[in-house]
Amino acid sequence: MAAVEAETGLLTLESLPTDPLLLILSFVDYRDLINCCYVSRRLSQLSTHDPLWRRHCKKYWLISEEEKAGKSQCWRSLFIETYSDVGRYIDHYAAIKKAWRDLKKYLEPRCPRMVLSLKEGAREEDLDAVEAQIGCKLPDDYRCSYRIHNGQKLVVPGLLGSMALSNHYRSEDLLDVDTAAGGFQQRQGLKYCLPLTFCIHTGLSQYIAVEAAEGRNKNEVFYQCPDQMARNPAAIDMFIIGATFTDWFTSYVNNVVSGGFPIIRDQIFRYIHDPECVATTGDITVSVSTSFLPELSSVHPPHYFFTYRIRIEMSRDALPEKACQLDSRYWRITNAKGDVEEVQGPGVVGEFPIISPGRIYEYTSCTTFSTTSGYMEGYYTFHFLYFKDKVFNVAIPRFHMACPTFRVSIARLEMGPDEYEEMEEEAEEEEEEENDDSADMDESDESDADENESDEGEGEARRRRVFDVPIRRRRCSRLF
């Protein structure tokens, strides 16, 4: 061989010195590195060079130097050992493990009870047993996540976020795989759907489609939204939350750890804040964050429910005589069709807050649209505490609200034209009756009605069997 190389003057790969060969092998993927073992004795020896496997351990398994130091194993044996355990998830493991690691690191000092509620990872045989029970294969990225943490204990607050209004509360727990399997759906409208989350207060769940059926794409994550205009219980529309489990989980975690979702009273609140949605008037700054509530919304009839959280803050550098009190609010509300509604009233949510240097006042309210999106803007009127006759307006920045992408139930798409027209007429009659009733109510009456609805809703939730029936949506009063 050497004689042939000397005669031809060619330089083969194996004739290269060790260092250049190791450099080349450092760019080779783990599969090709393993295959090098079968090419020649020399490549087989070089492919076991331990530093080559350090990169793969960090890339695929996120094993740190500190973790390695705590084990009496080389990088290569660590890679092989981990691969033998979770190798089937190698395309998902790094993204899922990073999301879990980042989430726990962020929540430990802020929501320690939530982190303590997480369960240990499930075993492969546990996941296999669930697949046998439901008769469907679980997505690999779902299985991968549950190998790390098998959901959480059904406690409040839930890991997947909360939302609170004066007469409504939601907190979603991440279900363990056995509880989820008990809620696996075989009925029409949600066939082959597995619940991911559950709220013990509202019965709300997010589902993942483990098979493509009834117009859903495989692995899609969604909120169910029963069609309230159809007589067919299988008519269930969907608000799409994620294309896959990985997309759904990692995007949620990114919103949490980036500070996009605020932590309020040891809970994650699913408000989205646009950094540009801030307005400053003099020493007062107003910022807004919003959230869509699927459990209080419907596609048929079109009723999209949003809540918004407003923060009013006076600069610490403001002079003491700039202290002021909010007198009234003015809103200009525009839907996607360009229809405008103007609302003016005293105070905010029944209060007349005093703002002084360094003080922050926050409140939550809600609104609804008959279109999938809309926006609000307006101003507050204040008077100075030391100069009560002097009033001024503070701008509220324009903030946009839009519901997630939704998909209409195939049961509605298969509906005949006569049946559809009849449903539309019934819905219009119901809407007219609701409008007539609401026109006779003043603000205090609305508040009383809200409290009664809340009490009734709690009783209804206690009576409802978990995962048994679609959520019956109740309309909260529109607040400004």
UniProtKB/Swiss-Prot annotation:
Subcellular localization(s) per the UniProt record: Nucleus
A Gene Ontology BP annotation from the UniProt entry: response to lipopolysaccharide
Main location class: nucleus
Residue intervals of the ApaG domain: 278-408
Pfam families membership: DUF525, F-box-like, SMI1_KNR4
Key word Nucleus present: yes
InterPro entries per the UniProt record, alphabetical: ApaG_domain (IPR007474), ApaG_sf (IPR036767), F-box-like_dom_sf (IPR036047), F-box_dom (IPR001810), F-box_SCF_Substrate_Recog (IPR052121), Knr4/Smi1-like_dom (IPR018958), Knr4/Smi1-like_sf (IPR037883)
Stretches the record annotates as Disordered: 419-463
Keywords on record: Nucleus, Ubl conjugation pathway
Gene3D superfamilies listed in its UniProt record: 1.20.1280.50, ApaG domain (2.60.40.1470), SMI1/KNR4-like (3.40.1580.10)
NCBIfam families from the UniProt entry: PRK05461.1 (NF003967)
Described function: Substrate recognition component of the SCF (SKP1-CUL1-F-box protein)-type E3 ubiquitin ligase complex, SCF(FBXO3), which mediates the ubiquitination and subsequent proteasomal degradation of target proteins. Mediates the ubiquitination of HIPK2 and probably that of EP300, leading to rapid degradation by the proteasome. In the presence of PML, HIPK2 ubiquitination still occurs, but degradation is prevented. PML, HIPK2 and FBXO3 may act synergically to activate p53/TP53-dependent transactivation.
Subunit structure, interactors included: Part of a SCF (SKP1-cullin-F-box) protein ligase complex SCF(FBXO3) consisting of FBXO3, SKP1, CUL1 and RBX1. Interacts with PML, interaction is direct and takes place either alone or within the SCF complex.
Protein's name according to its UniProt entry: F-box only protein 3
Organism of this sequence: Mus musculus (Mouse)
